Amino acid sequence: MTAILVTGYRSFELGIFSEKDKRVAIIKKAIKRDLIAYLEEGVDWFIFTGNLGFEQWALEVANDLKKTYPLKTATIFAFETHGSTWNDRNQQQLQQFRATDFVKYSYPSYESPKQLKSYHHFLIHNTDGAYLFYDSEHETRLSYLVAAMKEQPCYPLSFLSFERLNDIADE
């Protein structure tokens, strides 16, 4: 079994506030190419943390690919309360994560920063690599997870870059 953690920018961090934004189609096109490459290398699980934006789009692509490839998806939330304050539209999108093949949460609710560090450790040590849409020049709180990943000597990281998205848009 090979499991890849999929994470990246949230939609608001990219300035995307509608699924009709033309950038979403470009991002999904890149995701599809990359997920197919992973599947052809033998990956059979894609693991998500339940964030809207890149993860949501990757989950949608993975669900479409299930028609052709034998893959599984999982969501491991940091907290059981993840998304509890989101609006109705976002709650509906959150349901996609709750409908994956495997769903768990690490903690009932947030109590201290140590929980997030432990959660990151768990994700890294229970996956075989990560697929990220993240650029260190455009930092978000995802930087903590990326830094923890980079500390692992044999933890492969694959990044989707803004440059690559521009190339796909130009096709």
From Swiss-Prot:
Q: What is the superkingdom listed in this entry's lineage?
A: Bacteria
- Gene3D superfamilies referenced in this protein's UniProt entry, alphabetically: 3.40.50.450
InterPro entries reported in the protein's UniProt record: YspA (IPR010697)
Coiled coil location: none
Q: Name one Pfam family in it.
A: YpsA
Question: What does the sequence similarity comment in the record state about its family?
Answer: Belongs to the UPF0398 family.
Q: Which PANTHER family does the record match to this protein?
A: UPF0398 PROTEIN SPR0331 (PTHR38440:SF1), UPF0398 PROTEIN YPSA (PTHR38440)
From the Swiss-Prot or TrEMBL record, give the protein name: UPF0398 protein SZO_03970
State the species of origin. Answer: Streptococcus equi subsp. zooepidemicus (strain H70)
